[in-house]
Amino acid sequence: MEEIQRYLQLERSQQQHHFLYPLIFQEYIYVFAHDRGFSRSILSENRGYDNKSSFLLVKRLITRMYQQNHXIIFSNDSNQNLFWGRNKNLYSQILSEGFSFILEIPFSLRLISYLEGKKKKIVKSQNLRSIHSTFPFLEDNFSHLNFLLDILIPHSVHAEILVQTLRYWLKDASSLHLLRFFLNEYCNWNRLITPKKASSSFSKRNQRLFLFLYNYHVCEYESIFVFLRNQSSHLRSTSSGVFLERIYFYGKVERLVNVFGKVKDFQENLWLVKEPCMHYVRYQRKSXLASKGTSLLMNKWKCYLVTFWQWYFSLWFHPRRIYINQLSNHSLEFLGYLASVRMNPSVVRSQILENSFLINNAIKKFDTLVPIIPLIASLAKAKFCNLLGHPISKPVWXDLSDSNIIDRFGRICRNLSHYHSGSSKKKSLYRIKYILRFSCAXTLARKHKSTVRAFLKKLGSELLQEFLMSEEDVLSLTFPKASSTLRGVYSSRIWYLDIICINDLANLK
């Protein structure tokens, strides 16, 4: 760690380009990356890993990489590749750990230098990491807007384009050249940045490099919004990220000015996309750009974004990845919710002297609903019910103790209720609780070779109260001193600031 700090101080003091290639041959880099815990469980499966991850091994790997025939290195048949041999998984794991740790250094330096130059301080708050912190932003702003650009960030990009993009940030040809060799070993780039298509073995072995490259790729697409935000002071944006998003929002404006300077008549055509009220939010590959303008303005935005991304990344960006929807009659699938802006009618009685009359007012309200059909599909995939939503037993858990079975069902139920506490209509969650309740009862009845009715009649319904805890009980336990003042609050929307990931029903032990 001291070696890294000395290197960073030397790099920052000299203010030179980031020559990271010598760090690849430093053993403490791999030890430090290993101790970060990104793949600790997988690394522990290889006995003697710390002995294998040495300076001599890394140097030998890189030397052999450059000496190999290009026809062998770029071969599609991984079994015929003589470079990796039998230890392909271990070698790629070692190099990916080193790459991921070393590539983060210039981004950290840029962030530190910007903060020192601007003398700004970032408020460190874990609450800003919560997924639920995005919804108050949507409530405050989206209810006043009209149109929405529903954007799906593309994932298909060639490895060479990524390396060329990294050259804007990283001025080290040797490191980029070695990274190009490593990426070409996995010639299918979709496997690198598409979580659904990535093989489990690759994503586990290269999880840190996987996340870094994916976030970098996504942030490159977001770079256009950073530039336009400085052109129009009313362009407001937020992003549900921690590391790379801050760097791009702080330090990428200068390079974007140079990049956009190459586009002919860019400044003259900027008025086409200027809008006094624009809001942008993104989570993973799903992003939304809302506006108070007209349909014509949103079509100009769509055309502009497609043209820019095609020119900047040198790839085909299909216009159908951007949908123009009207917020008043469209529901946005975002972060496990169905969000929409609906008209909330309100009748006010007014009386002047002896005359009284009614005034009908329609107020726009941001509405969030629980997507019941996708939730039932997730429960069916996890074998808690069938596709029609009828509860079934969980035979995989039949060998566990009764208390362990009830605890697992209760934890799933509480997590779902906790995450969907921001729903406008919580009655839809009753069906989910019903499925989990009777699935738990069916599992226990099957274990004891009895029927569900006889099992509940024998043991009583109190056995299942643990995972049927209501939101009011959760608030009472969370705020015991203010339990009397919180009556009725549980019926409204509640956003928790301790949720950092979407509940995955398939990720069960």
UniProtKB/Swiss-Prot annotation:
An annotated Gene Ontology molecular function: RNA binding
Coiled coil spans: none
Matches recorded under Pfam families: Intron_maturas2, MatK_N
Keywords for the protein's UniProt record, in alphabetical order: Chloroplast, mRNA processing, Plastid, RNA-binding, tRNA processing
Keyword RNA-binding recorded: yes
Location in or out of the cell: Plastid, Chloroplast
Domain of life according to the entry: Eukaryota
Keyword Glycosyltransferase carried by entry: no
An annotated GO BP: tRNA processing
InterPro entries on file: Domain_X, Maturase_MatK, Maturase_MatK_N
Primary location: plastid
GO CC terms in record: chloroplast
Its job: Usually encoded in the trnK tRNA gene intron. Probably assists in splicing its own and other chloroplast group II introns.
The family this protein is said to belong to: Belongs to the intron maturase 2 family. MatK subfamily.
Cross-referenced PANTHER family: MATURASE K
Protein name from the UniProt record: Maturase K
Native organism: Verbascum thapsus
Native organism taxonomy: Eukaryota, Viridiplantae, Streptophyta, Embryophyta, Tracheophyta
Gene expressing this chain: matK
